[in-house]
Swiss-Prot record:
Name of the gene encoding the protein in the UniProt record: esr1
Keywords: DNA-binding, Lipid-binding, Metal-binding, Nucleus, Receptor, Steroid-binding, Transcription, Transcription regulation, Zinc, Zinc-finger
Region of interest: Hinge: 253-315
Cellular localisation: Nucleus
Full protein name: Estrogen receptor
Lineage summary: Eukaryota, Metazoa, Chordata, Craniata, Vertebrata
Region Modulating: start-end pairs: 1-186
Length: 617
C-alpha cells in the first residue's frame, strides 16, 4: 500500500471508529419507533460530526465535516422537544452514557442532571408513564429506577406513576427535576371527569348544575321504572328522579364545601361541641380533683364517685370501643337435644333455660362496661332489672342479622317463624323481632355500633324517674349520665370514621338510636307473654329469671333482691340455676289473672327469713 493510499484511508477509518463507539452506547434503533411529531429530516453539526435523522425511514447518518478542528466531540438528542429550554446538555465528566432516544408525543422525559461537580452515580432522569406500559429510558434508568404511585382514580385504569432512583417516596435529590401530575378526579354521581368540589362532593359541571336546579326549584321528578335506573356518563339524563336520588346518596347537600378550603361560609362564634370538649380533656389528662369540683354537692352522690367519673371522662372513644368489644360474652349452646317438631312446652323450656344462662353472663358483661362497677349496688341492680330483656333481645337480633327469616337463640337452637307460631302468643313477638333484624340488616350494623347500643340500653333504662313513680331514683345519677355520654361519644366517633358525609353521619346516628324504642316495645310484649306462661304453669322458671320477672310484678324497683345482690356483688361461678317448682318449696296464693280469667300462683321467696327478719310482703 502506498503512502498516499494510507493517507487517503485514514479519515475513513477514524470516521468508522467514531461511529462504532457511538453505536455501542446507544440503544437499538430497531426497537424504537421515531415520533410522528417530526416528519421532516433534520441535520445538526456538532464537533466535526454531522448527524442527519431520517424520521420516515427510522435511520441515522453520520458524516465528517471537512472543516472540523480537533475539538472535543459532544452529543445531543437527535429529536429534541419543541421547547428546547427544558433539555439540558450532559456536562463534562458525566457518567451517563450518550443515548439517542426520540421523544414521545405523549410522555416527555425530563433530564435532571446537576451542574458540574455535583453529579452523583445514582442520578437518573424522571419519567411519567401509565402503569403497565413501556417507557423510553436508558440502560442506567432500567437498572436503578423505582416506581412510586402518584394518583389513581377509583374505577379507572389510567394510574400515573413517577419513576426515579431517589427512594420509595419518589422525591428527587437536591438537583433532581420532576414534573407534577394534575390529580384526576371523577364525578361521584355519573363517573365523568369532575370539574371541582361542588355541594360537598367531587362532581362534574352537569351534575352540579342539575343538583342546583333541583334544590332551587320545585322538582316533581317521577321515575318511569323501578327507581333503580343506572346513572352514568351516557345515561345520566335518562331519569331525573334517579339522578337526584343518587346525588343525595353520594352526599351532595346544599351548602356543602371542601373542608380544606372552607368555602364561602360565614363563621360564627359557637361553643365547641361536647365531643370536642371531651377530646380536649383527653389530651390535657384531666385529674380527678378537677372532676370532683364539678360534681353536684347535694349529698346524693356517693363518697367514692369522683375517681370513677374521672376515669370515665378521661377515656378516649377508641378505649371505650375496645373495652366494650372485649366485654362481649361468648355465644352459648342449648346443650339439650329434642326431636323436631318442637312442642309448645319444649320451646318454652328451651327458651327459658337459655335466658337464665344468658342472665348470668349478662351480669359479668355489665361489670366490664366502663364505670359500671363504680356505681352503688343499688344502682347496678336497678339498671339490670330495668333492661335485662332488652339486652337479651338486642343480642338475639345481632346473632340473627345474617340469617334472614330465622332467629338464632343459640348455636344449636335456631327457630323460624313457623316454629314460633306453635307457642300461644309468640307469633306477634316473632314478627316484631324478624322485622327489627331486617332493619338492622339494611343498615349494615357493625359490631362497634352494636356494643355501643347495648351499653346505652343498660344505662338509659334508669336514667329518668318521676315523683309519682314507685321506682327510687338512681343514687349516682350524675355518674350514669357521664357514662352514657361517653359511650354515645364513642358511637358518634365510630360513625364519623366511616367516610360518609356529615349529613349521612347524623342520619345514621338517628336511625340507630330510634330502633331502641322498638326494642323496648318488644321487651314489654315479651315480659307480658312470659308472665302469662308462668301463670299457666306451662314452663319451669329458674331462680334468676323468676327474680327478674317478679321485679316488675310483685316488688317495686329499687329494693335489692337477695339473689340479684348476691350475683352482682360477686363473680358468677355457675352457668345455670335450678328451676323453681310450684309444689315443694314455694308457698302459693291464688290470685285472679285479669287477662284470661285463670288462677295465677304468686310465688313468694322459697327460703324462710333469717333471725331478726320479717317475711317479704
Amino acid at each position: 500500500m502506498s503512502e498516499e493510499q494510507a493517507r487517503a484511508e485514514a479519515p475513513a477509518g477514524a470516521r468508522q471508529r467514531r461511529r462504532s463507539e457511538l453505536e455501542g452506547y446507544s440503544v437499538s434503533l430497531a426497537s424504537l419507533k421515531l415520533s410522528p411529531m417530526y416528519p421532516e429530516e433534520e441535520q445538526r453539526t456538532t464537533g466535526g460530526i454531522s448527524s442527519t435523522a431520517h424520521y420516515l425511514d427510522g435511520t441515522f447518518n453520520y458524516t465528517t465535516n471537512p472543516d472540523a478542528t480537533n475539538s472535543s466531540v459532544d452529543y445531543y438528542s437527535v429529536a429534541p422537544e419543541p421547547q428546547e429550554e427544558n433539555l439540558q446538555p450532559l456536562p463534562n465528566g458525566s457518567s451517563s452514557p450518550p443515548v439517542f432516544v426520540p421523544s414521545s408525543p405523549q410522555l416527555s422525559p425530563f433530564l435532571g442532571h446537576p451542574p458540574a461537580g455535583q453529579h452523583t452515580a445514582q442520578q437518573v432522569p424522571y419519567y411519567l408513564e401509565p402503569s403497565g406500559t413501556s417507557i423510553y429510558r436508558s440502560s442506567v434508568l432500567a437498572s436503578a429506577g423505582s416506581r412510586v404511585e402518584l394518583c389513581s382514580a377509583p374505577g379507572r385504569q389510567d394510574v400515573y406513576t413517577a419513576v426515579g432512583a431517589s427512594g420509595p417516596s419518589g422525591a428527587s435529590g437536591p438537583s433532581g427535576a420532576i414534573g407534577l401530575v394534575k390529580e384526576i378526579r371523577y364525578c361521584s354521581v355519573c363517573s365523568d371527569y369532575a370539574s371541582g368540589y361542588h355541594y360537598g362532593v367531587w362532581s362534574c359541571e352537569g351534575c352540579k348544575a342539575f343538583f342546583k336546579r333541583s334544590i332551587q326549584g320545585h322538582n316533581d321528578y317521577v321515575c318511569p321504572a323501578t327507581n333503580q335506573c343506572t346513572i352514568d356518563r351516557n345515561r345520566r339524563k335518562s331519569c331525573q328522579a334517579c339522578r337526584l336520588r343518587k346525588c343525595y346518596e353520594v352526599g351532595m347537600m346544599k351548602g356543602g364545601f371542601r373542608k380544606e378550603r372552607g368555602g364561602r361560609i360565614i363563621k360564627h362564634n359557637r361553643r365547641p361541641s361536647g365531643l370536642k370538649e371531651r377530646e380536649r380533656g383527653y389530651s390535657k389528662a384531666q385529674s380527678g380533683s378537677d372532676v370532683r369540683e364539678a360534681l353536684p354537692q347535694d349529698g346524693q352522690s356517693s363518697s367514692g364517685i369522683g375517681g370513677g367519673v374521672a376515669d370515665v371522662v378521661c377515656m378516649s372513644p377508641e378505649q371505650v370501643l375496645l373495652l366494650l368489644l372485649r366485654a362481649e360474652p361468648p355465644t352459648l349452646c342449648s346443650r339439650q337435644k329434642h326431636s323436631r317438631p318442637y312442642s309448645e312446652l319444649t320451646i318454652m323450656s328451651l327458651l327459658t333455660n337459655m335466658a337464665d344462662r344468658e342472665l348470668v353472663h349478662m351480669i359479668a358483661w355489665a361489670k366490664k362496661v366502663p364505670g359500671f362497677q363504680d356505681l352503688s349496688l343499688h344502682d347496678q341492680v336497678q339498671l339490670l332489672e330495668s333492661s335485662w330483656l332488652e339486652i337479651l333481645m338486642i343480642g338475639l337480633i345481632w346473632r340473627s342479622i345474617y340469617t334472614p327469616g330465622k332467629l338464632i337463640f343459640a348455636q344449636d337452637l335456631i327457630l323460624d317463624k313457623s316454629e314460633g307460631e306453635c307457642v300461644e302468643g309468640m307469633a306477634e313477638i316473632f314478627d316484631m323481632l324478624l322485622a327489627t333484624v331486617a332493619r338492622f340488616r339494611t343498615l349494615k350494623l357493625k359490631s362497634e355500633e352494636f356494643v355501643c347500643l347495648k351499653a346505652i340500653i343498660l344505662l338509659n333504662s334508669g336514667a329518668f324517674s318521676f315523683c309519682s313513680s314507685p321506682v327510687e331514683p338512681l343514687r349516682d345519677g350524675f355518674m350514669v349520665q357521664c357514662m352514657m355520654d361517653n359511650i354515645t361519644d364513642a358511637l358518634i366517633y365510630y360513625i364519623s370514621q366511616s367516610g360518609i358525609s356529615v349529613q349521612l353521619q347524623s342520619r345514621r346516628q338517628a336511625q340507630l338510636l330510634l330502633l331502641l324504642s322498638h326494642i323496648r316495645h318488644m321487651s314489654y310484649k315479651g315480659m307480658e307473654h312470659l308472665y302469662s306462661m308462668k301463670c299457666k304453669n306451662k314452663v319451669p322458671l329458674y331462680d334468676l329469671l323468676l327474680e327478674m320477672l317478679d321485679a316488675h310484678r310483685l316488688r317495686p324497683l329499687g329494693k335489692v333482691p337477695r339473689i340479684w345482690a348476691d350475683r352482682v356483688s360477686s363473680s358468677p361461678t355457675t352457668t345455670a340455676t335450678t328451676p323453681t317448682t310450684n309444689t315443694t318449696t314455694t308457698t302459693t296464693t291464688t290470685t285472679h289473672h285479669p287477662s284470661n280469667g285463670s288462677t295465677c300462683p304468686a310465688d313468694l321467696p322459697s327460703n324462710p327469713p333469717g333471725p331478726g327478719q320479717s317475711p317479704s310482703p
